[in-house]
Amino acid sequence: MKNEMLALILAGGQGTRLGKLTQSIAKPAVQFGGRYRIIDFALSNCANSGIHNVGVITQYQPLALNSHIGNGSSWGLDGINSGVSILQPYSASEGNRWFEGTSHAIYQNIDYIDSINPEYVLILSGDHIYKMDYDDMLQSHKDNNASLTVAVLDVPLKEASRFGIMNTDANNRIVEFEEKPENPKSTKASMGIYIFDWQRLRNMLVAAEKSNVDMSDFGKNVIPNYLESGESVYAYDFAGYWKDVGTVESLWEANMEYISPENALDSRNRRWKIYSRNLISPPNFISENSHVEDSLVVDGCFVDGTVKHSILSTGAQVKKGAVIEDSVIMSGAVIGKDAKIKRAIIGEGAIISDGVEIDGTEEVYVVGYNEKVGVPKDED
């Protein structure tokens, strides 16, 4: 049976610019907003868009991500005619190797894609924060009779050189693609979201492999090849909230923006929910000595200090006299008595000892996964 569209989420990135936060886990597995992981947004978009089959392509430190996704039940993707498949690099008889680029990861999973037999493939990044109706993008792809549709976001001209830029005609057909141009002609930036007619993409990738032609990356190789070959390539304009959280600063900013009840992600919209795998936790405890304002406090937290404009993730502890401002405290982290935390991201399971002061005023301060700060070595 032919399926209309298969989603493939590229989730193998190391995320080196996130420093300590990705030393032990892949970037898409990093926590966000108190109860989510970054990949939840792409998975939830798929579920809300009516996409029933999703392949998650992993590579770097995949264990936490694999455990989080499980069988896809948290996103309603565990039905008879639906499912989530974790796709990791493997060695085949031809000596296949680690994924060498975004489109090379697709090539290495041709057998899986063929088993789903889709008419279209939707390529997604697993490390962006946004809500998007992929079904609307697919309808645009069909209406234009396109071979490839690229989701684009209008960015300020001064930032355009950071992105792949699409130059389009009056009908939004892409006539030129420039990868991070010094002098951009347009402000339509690629979001790294693509819809391809599967057979056309498949034929191109197979032919390139046989001819030893480099087609390992969508931005550097595939899109330019499509344009040079005269394929119909169109832009799909996206006007909603979208955040690339590839740096510590941008991840911190996105979390701070999320605190607002009227945040641009519209997190309380019941018609487009963001789903996640959430383990059952005990109720919060907020002591009579505590003071909490303008903050998100998730299940299982213990608060006996002061929390201002911050996020406390599942099971975080803030002990007596501690003060937390403009910070993200991830799951299971413990902030000791009289500690002072300002403008920081404290990783999962981290321990901040009593009286420690952390000030990220000049640059967002990061404490890594299970890191201990101020704990004597004999107690480490």
UniProtKB/Swiss-Prot annotation:
GO biological process terms on file: glycogen biosynthetic process
Family recorded in the similarity comment: Belongs to the bacterial/plant glucose-1-phosphate adenylyltransferase family.
This enzyme's EC code(s): 2.7.7.27
Protein residues bound to alpha-D-glucose 1-phosphate: 164, 179-180, 190
UniProt KW Magnesium keyword: no
Full protein name: Glucose-1-phosphate adenylyltransferase
Gene Ontology MF, one: glucose-1-phosphate adenylyltransferase activity
Oligomer and partners: Homotetramer.
Record field: transmembrane: none
Role noted for this protein: Involved in the biosynthesis of ADP-glucose, a building block required for the elongation reactions to produce glycogen. Catalyzes the reaction between ATP and alpha-D-glucose 1-phosphate (G1P) to produce pyrophosphate and ADP-Glc.
Enzyme class: transferase
Superkingdom assignment: Bacteria
Annotated metabolic or biological route of this protein: Glycan biosynthesis; glycogen biosynthesis
Annotated keywords: ATP-binding, Carbohydrate metabolism, Glycogen biosynthesis, Glycogen metabolism, Nucleotide-binding, Nucleotidyltransferase, Transferase
The UniProt record lists the keyword Nucleotidyltransferase: yes
Reactions catalysed, as given in the entry: alpha-D-glucose 1-phosphate + ATP + H(+) = ADP-alpha-D-glucose + diphosphate
HAMAP family named in the record: GlgC
Species for this entry: Streptococcus sanguinis (strain SK36)
